[in-house]
UniProtKB/Swiss-Prot annotation:
Record-given protein name: Poly(rC)-binding protein 2
Lineage: Eukaryota, Metazoa, Chordata, Craniata, Vertebrata
Mod. after translation: Phosphorylated. The non-phosphorylated form(s) exhibited the strongest poly(rC)-binding activity.
KH domain: residues covered: 13-75, 97-162, 284-348
Species in which this protein is naturally found: Mus musculus (Mouse)
UniProt-listed GO biological process terms: defense response to virus; innate immune response; negative regulation of defense response to virus; positive regulation of transcription by RNA polymerase II; proteasome-mediated ubiquitin-dependent protein catabolic process; protein maturation
Length: 362
């Protein structure tokens, strides 16, 4: 696949997420939202912006490829305009490049970098853009930031090439999306980072289309398509089962006995081995989460029943640190394969979202 496929469309739907500072986002939104409204109307893309009480915010672009890149070009042009305005009274000798950050699943970064860095070198040389892939995942997520800098056309071409790589190499395991931490709430939910921008209280989860985004702002019938972000690359039967577990958990609280998320015996072979085998041969790693003290109980459950269910279903080891005096949070360490860790994170987030009403019931 080459960038001609991206440019030609072929009914491929993309979802691109940009991580921006509040000032940049304010410029894109414009006075009374006029700027972003114009971008939506002229591009035909869905443009959603995460809640405003964070130092950083996520801008999500979704739609057919031609609409996505029209909107993307308009955003780049706006950033370029802002640089020009800032240079008017500046004494700086050189003009800074346009710089932005993409947010992508960490499991796809290897394909983007390539063996010995050959792929990312090729992208740099062919587009003229500077590209840097962050070594660490963004907090409470399985995603990394990719920083791109250059002139507008170089950045646009660079992002197109990145999209091609992402489409050819879908993410592995469950993607936990990065959500900038609001100043008023430390909880990270699995339902996507833009839920508050529409005022909706309900979360949208994938049903039978494996390429749908876990993003409540992008509701409605999906196109037959690939998506780049939020895609689940686990087999469809596994995805359907995970969805059923999550949905039934939101409607029927977990019991205090051995019944699990879906009312199935959590000690049964169906649950105990099903998810644990997703990536059983993979290298063992660890990931840390921070959960507020007042919500840790819903993760542990009575006599540890709920945390044990999550351990059995994911195959991961989960350790919850003892309370620290003066701290409002508890440290949770998850150890296992990448797939086990991702699934454990997902199930923990389901519990948090259900407890706080974030998943709702319909």
């Amino acid at each position: 696949m080459d960038t001609g496929v991206i440019e030609g469309g072929l009914n491929v739907t993309l979802t691109i997420r940009l991580l921006m500072h509040g000032k940049e986002v304010g410029s894109i939104i414009g006075k009374k939202g006029e700027s972003v409204k114009k971008m939506r109307e002229e591009s035909g893309a869905r443009i959603n912006i995460s809640e405003g009480n964070c130092p950083e915010r996520i801008i999500t672009l979704a739609g057919p490829t031609n609409a996505i890149f029209k909107a993307f070009a308009m955003i780049i042009d706006k950033l370029e305009e802002d640089i020009s305005s800032s240079m008017t009274n500046s004494t700086a000798a050189s003009r800074p490049p346009v710089t932005l950050r993409l947010v992508v699943p960490a499991s796809q970064c290897g394909s983007l970098i390539g063996k010995g860095g050959c792929k990312i070198k090729e992208i740099r040389e062919s587009t003229g853009a500077q590209v840097q892939v962050a070594g660490d995942m963004l907090p409470n997520s399985t995603e990394r930031a990719i920083t791109i800098a250059g002139i507008p056309q170089s950045i646009i071409e660079c992002v197109k090439q990145i999209c091609v790589v992402m489409l050819e190499s879908p993410p592995k395991g469950v993607t936990i999306p990065y959500r900038p931490k609001p100043s008023s709430s430390p909880v990270i939910f699995a339902g996507g980072q833009d839920r508050y921008s529409t005022g909706s209280d309900s979360a949208s989860f994938p049903h039978t289309t494996p390429s749908m985004c876990l993003n409540p702002d992008l509701e409605g019938p999906p196109l037959e398509a690939y998506t780049i972000q939020g895609q689940y690359a686990i087999p469809q039967p596994d995805l359907t089962k995970l969805h059923q577990l999550a949905m039934q958990q939101s409607h029927f609280p977990m019991t205090h006995g051995n019944t699990g998320f879906s009312g199935i015996e959590s000690s049964s072979p169906e649950v105990k081995g099903y998810w644990a085998g997703l990536d059983a041969s993979a290298q063992t790693t660890s990931h840390e989460l921070t959960i507020p003290n007042d919500l840790i109980g819903c993760i542990i459950g009575r006599q540890g029943a709920k945390i044990n269910e999550i351990r059995q279903m994911s195959g991961a080891q989960i350790k919850i640190a003892n309370p620290v005096e003066g701290s409002t949070d508890r440290q949770v360490t998850i150890t296992g394969s990448a797939a086990s860790i991702s699934l454990a994170q997902y199930l923990i987030n389901v519990r948090l979202s259900s407890e706080t009403g974030g998943m709702g019931s319909s």
